[in-house]
């Protein structure tokens, strides 16, 4: 009975790990961020200067860790902690399951994985946690080079770009939903609108006013 229970518990834990590591899908709604795709995974990217507190949620980060900011996010997957001692100190530390490498918190299993043109992610298809490479768009893992992102290859975009006048585009090594050619994002409505002569005129007027103000100052 104990062996059966132990086996059930082990399988439950492994399934839970796999489920938790595969939270981001094409249907994920990133809170205060947007969805991007690389060759082997999807992830949420934060808007402006926000940081990821988990795989789906972005929040404002604190600029300094002190007694008022304990447990507040100070970077992607990191938070301020209190370090007991004499005197007491405060520091920005990675969340459980992550390690700091080059000032970035990455999964523990990725500490010794080098990908080149891509990044290391957790392999959610493997019941044993391992780090694998997910490549920039235009590159794929090379089995002859320790699965690093050193081989040219295509990845089909799977993002659901459902807003009006937007489409999937490859930008700086990732797929993201962006405005179609001839359209520009309206910051107030977050909708892609036609970049017409009227828009150009408005920009020209703003540029002239800015130039006049600059020279007056």
UniProtKB/Swiss-Prot annotation:
Keyword Transcription regulation in record: no
Disulphide connectivity of cysteines: 65-80, 74-92, 94-105, 110-120, 115-133, 135-149, 157-168, 161-177, 179-192
EGF-like domain location: 30-59, 61-106, 106-150, 153-193
Pfam families (UniProt xref): Plasmod_Pvs28 (PF06247)
Intracellular or extracellular location(s): Cell membrane
Glycosylation (residues): 112, 165, 187, 202
Primary location group: membrane
Bilayer disposition of the protein: Lipid-anchor; GPI-anchor
Keyword entries, A-Z: Cell membrane, Disulfide bond, EGF-like domain, Glycoprotein, GPI-anchor, Lipoprotein, Malaria, Membrane, Repeat, Signal
Record propeptide residues: 197-217
GO cellular component entries: cell surface; plasma membrane; side of membrane
Keyword Cell membrane: yes
Source species, domain of life: Eukaryota
Lipidation (GPI-anchor amidated serine): 196
UniProt cross-references to InterPro entries, sorted A to Z: EGF-like_dom (IPR000742), Pvs25/Psv28_EGF (IPR010423)
Signal peptide positions on this chain: 1-16
UniProt-recorded name of the protein: 25 kDa ookinete surface antigen
Organism of provenance: Plasmodium falciparum (isolate NF54)
């Amino acid at each position: 009975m104990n062996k059966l229970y132990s086996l059930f518990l082990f399988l439950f834990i492994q399934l839970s790990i796999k489920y938790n590591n595969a939270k981001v899908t094409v249907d994920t709604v990133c809170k205060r961020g947007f969805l991007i795709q690389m060759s082997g995974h999807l992830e949420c990217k934060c808007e402006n200067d926000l940081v990821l507190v988990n795989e789906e949620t972005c929040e404002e980060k604190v600029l300094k860790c002190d007694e008022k900011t304990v447990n507040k996010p100070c970077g992607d997957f990191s938070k301020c902690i209190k370090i007991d001692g004499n005197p007491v100190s405060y520091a920005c530390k990675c969340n459980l399951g992550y390690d700091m490498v080059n000032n970035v918190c990455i999964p523990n299993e990725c500490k010794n994985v080098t990908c080149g043109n891509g990044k290391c992610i957790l392999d959610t298809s493997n019941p044993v946690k391992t780090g694998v490479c997910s490549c920039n768009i235009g590159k794929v893992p090379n089995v002859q080079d320790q699965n690093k992102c050193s081989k040219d290859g295509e990845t089909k975009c799977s993002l659901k770009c459902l807003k009006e006048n937007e489409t999937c585009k490859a930008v700086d090594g990732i797929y993201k939903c962006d405005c179609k050619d001839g359209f520009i994002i309206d910051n107030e409505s977050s909708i892609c609108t036609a970049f017409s002569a009227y828009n150009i005129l408005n920009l020209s007027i703003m540029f002239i006013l800015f130039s006049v103000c600059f020279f007056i100052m």
